Amino acid sequence: MAIPEVMDTGAASVEIPFSGLETEPILKLDYAAGVQTKLCDIDLSRQIPVAIMQHGDTVEYFWDSEGGTVFAHTAIRPDGSVEEQTVPRKFYPNLYDEYAAYDIWGTACKRLDWQTGELTTASLPFVQLDSVLGAVGSRVLLTRIVSDTPLPEGEGHEDMRDAVLQNSLREYDLYDPATNTIEKVFDEPYYPEDHNESKSYLGYCGDKLYFGVSHTDGVSALSRKNTLVSYDRTAGIWQEECSADAQNGEDSGFWPFLQDGRLKLVVLWRGKDTLTLYSIDNGARYEVPYEEAGSDATGNRNFPIALTDDGRILVTDGYIDRSGVAASRYALIDLGAYLAGSREYTAVEMWTE
């Protein structure tokens, strides 16, 4: 069973269990109280979840309908009241702050104001947007394709498009939605020189941007080594922070953990029964035992889920039965103790039907 993703604020986390039912709850876990409660139910027979966001104490659940005929968001207030509001145009938010939600894609930045509900659109000051990576303070890190000729669009032009990309750059920029301006950070060849290497953005801390680099064996496409690297925006310098090699033939991705929007902890490697973690704060590497989640609702212990504002970490702690469906149970533990290998948890009081 997959480890669930949660929308985390440092004080609480919000999640949709996705247990395969037509009606699912939206659950909130208050870290200080150590209690999980239900905010409301959502109807997945008519809603396709898009995103969960939060401003102040209000949780916003964005969704659209089958076929994309309706775009809406459900505001869940701290008093338990729920208000459904439609959005007049296609809106798939990929970022948010305390003022608005943003849908940055194609040639436009759409902004939905939390206070007024007004949806505005600004044309982006560049072309050939490649990806939106995440917030860096009040700005957005994104990539765009820089080429001598425009990229061919539409079906049937795949070979021509690939030929253009072979001689193009991927430029990393910081975009400011408030001023609609960009600042170049760095660029690199669109296709890496080493075709057995792939790079993914994990987060930022201070002036450094952090990336996970996976090295495959070129045959099975499985990662054989994961390396955490950083780029110092002020000095313009790349640095290798830490790396982890495969053992016993396993494959692993990266799991970044943020606090106040900044990268604090990274799972470099997920082995059969051990996690390799790296702390951004002190530059130390840790080996922490855990139990994989089994298809028969066994295991699922000690895998990190989120960091809390009070110096603890939320981890998996087995399963609970929720209306006949196995759901992850959570526990809280001091971060330092967790990294030292302790399992002296404080159990979370989980919501059940």
Set out the residue ranges of the language-model regions.
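Solenoidal tandem-repeat scaffolds enriched in leucines and small polar residues
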Residues: 133-136, 141-156, 160-172
